[in-house]
């Protein structure tokens, strides 16, 4: 693992804060709510960085901020050394291609009117990943990468199980050769037995393509299994940030201790 941290980080966040304005009414003035407070982290090529915290801790807000879905008020986010707040419109497509997300609910993130070939091929065509006459073969490769066969390309989302749908979401996400994959509660909607197979698949793909993961979950045991390092978020703040094994052995914060106790 040590060689992962020998180079420069692919993603660096420096003292980022994100505010939301709460609605004002007749009796109250407009107030701001700090969703992220002074967040700093480094993500290295080939690393899996776990983000753990309860609902409302700021996990998804942080991922949306990294993806430029949300703007942030303070701090700096560098992707491959470049400040993402200064990315120009023409560079945004390339930026978004390099950072892909796998969502929690695979059924909600798949178009029910499209078959699997259409779903996977759409981003390939949009980003011109390969020649037009190579698209079908590319989809065959991707479907094989996620442990399914070619017959699935003609099926529709409603014909698949939850685990199979999540595999399709993974195939679509990796179809554009991203550098960073954000897994946002990407196995929490699946049965426990299916979770393990999808987690193992993500690890296999990481080894094959040297992917870099940000793995977001409220399940500490899942995060420990996947991650090299773990960040614990509480009320928009980082309260713990260390190697996965060390975090369990020597948690720095009482909230981390409570999470560990609750996971057994």
Could you tell me what each predicted segment is?
Residues 67:
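Helix-to-loop junction immediately C-terminal to a conserved catalytic motif
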Residues 75-83:
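Conserved ABC transporter NBD signature motif
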Residues 83, 134-151, 260-261:
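Conserved ABC ATPase "signature" region
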Residues 156-160, 164:
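Conserved ABC ATPase signature
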Residues 223-225:
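A short, surface-exposed alpha-helical micro-motif characterized by mixed small hydrophobic
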Residues 241-242:
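ABC ATPase "signature
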């Amino acid at each position: 693992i040590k060689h992962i941290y020998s180079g420069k980080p692919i993603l660096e966040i420096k003292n980022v804060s994100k505010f939301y304005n709460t609605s004002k009414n007749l009796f109250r003035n407009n107030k701001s709510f700090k969703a992220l407070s002074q967040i700093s982290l480094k993500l290295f090529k080939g690393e899996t960085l776990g983000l753990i915290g309860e609902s409302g801790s700021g996990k998804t807000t942080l991922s949306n901020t990294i993806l430029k879905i949300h703007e942030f008020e303070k701090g700096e986010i560098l992707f491959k050394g470049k400040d993402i707040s200064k990315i120009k419109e023409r560079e945004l497509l390339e930026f978004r291609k390099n950072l892909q997300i796998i969502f929690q609910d695979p059924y909600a993130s798949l178009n029910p009117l499209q078959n699997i070939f259409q779903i996977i091929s759409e981003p390939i065509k949009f980003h011109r990943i390969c020649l037009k006459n190579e698209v079908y073969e590319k989809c065959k490769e991707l479907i094989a990468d996620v442990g399914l066969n070619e017959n699935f390309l003609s099926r529709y989302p409603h014909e698949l199980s939850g685990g199979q749908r999540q595999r399709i979401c993974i195939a679509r996400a990796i179809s554009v050769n991203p550098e960073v994959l954000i897994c946002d509660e990407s196995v929490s909607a699946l049965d426990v037995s299916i979770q393990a197979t999808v987690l193992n698949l993500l690890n296999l793909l990481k080894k094959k393509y040297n992917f870099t993961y940000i793995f977001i979950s409220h399940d500490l045991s899942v995060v420990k299994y996947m991650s090299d390092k773990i960040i614990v978020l509480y009320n928009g703040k980082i309260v713990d940030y260390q190697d996965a094994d060390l975090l369990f052995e020597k948690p720095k914060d009482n909230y981390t201790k409570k999470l560990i106790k609750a996971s057994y």
